[in-house]
Regions:
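Generic protein-terminus/edge-of-domain signal
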Residues: 1-35
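Short beta-strand segments in beta-sandwich/barrel cores
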Residues: 27, 33-39, 52-53, 61
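A cytosolic small-molecule/anion-sensing beta-strand core signal
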Residues: 32-33, 48-49, 67
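Short acidic-glycine-tyrosine-enriched beta hairpin
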Residues: 41-57
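Ligand-binding loop in jelly-roll beta-barrel domains
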Residues: 59-90
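An amphipathic alpha-helical interaction segment
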Residues: 93-153
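Basic/polar phosphate-binding segments, predominantly the helix-turn-helix DNA-binding elements
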Residues: 148-154, 172-208
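Short, Lys/Arg-enriched anionic-surface-contact patches
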Residues: 151-167
Length: 208
């Protein structure tokens, strides 16, 4: 069943990449741990722990969830007639919205044990919606975002673990676009197939 407002908490143990397409809902994404990259236009923006981003309906985007990333997400249906922010970007949580997200997480964990939490859950989401309506999303390229946007295979000033994820993401992208696996391994991993397979299991949790 599709609800007008839905809260989800998700943990990504391995690298996950969403297809680049226009989204069908408004979404508030808050990073608890790990790292998320959001692609808007030709730029990518790093969302670090403690940061949140707003993604409006019909926004063309792709999200990259790095391994060991925990996010909270609230989706708002386009059926809602409220005037949600139309621009994507970082948002500053209010004290109330932060407290609500924390309480939603706690309530979600108990929801399966008690039926009387459902109405309280809906009430909190309704209050959170009012907070969201006042958000003013801004796009600004942080130092980390800039390093990701400048990154290329031959030159990286990112931490080693981030570089590894970017190389593996590039490998997957090339193979999805039709490049032969052996050619990708030759180009990105100096022909070391065993090393490539080990890294696939480490980063993706499966072979490519």
């Amino acid at each position: 069943m599709n609800f007008a407002i839905e809260y989800t908490s998700a943990y990504f143990s391995h690298l996950a990449i969403t297809p680049r397409k226009k989204v069908l809902k408004h979404s508030l994404v808050s990073v608890q741990s790990g790292l998320v990259l959001i692609k808007l236009g030709k730029q990518e923006y790093a969302v670090e722990p403690g940061q949140s981003v707003w993604i409006p309906y019909d926004c063309l985007t792709s999200l990259t969830y790095f391994p060991n990333t925990q996010v909270n997400r609230v989706d708002f249906s386009v059926r809602l007639t409220d005037s949600f922010p139309r621009q994507a970007g970082y948002i500053t949580q209010t004290n109330l919205s932060s407290a609500l997200l924390e309480k939603l997480e706690q309530t979600k964990a108990r929801a399966s044990k008690a039926n009387n939490t459902e109405q309280a859950f809906k009430d909190m989401l309704s209050v959170l919606k009012q907070e969201v309506l006042s958000f003013k999303p801004l796009l600004c390229e942080s130092a980390l975002s800039q390093r990701f946007n400048q990154w290329n295979i031959d030159d990286s000033n990112l931490p080693q673990e981030h570089t590894l994820v970017m190389v593996m993401r590039e490998a997957k992208k090339r193979m999805q676009s039709g490049q032969k696996r052996s050619l990708v391994i030759d180009d990105l991993f100096s022909g070391k197939e065993e090393e490539f397979e080990q890294l696939c299991m480490l980063v993706f949790g499966e072979d490519l």
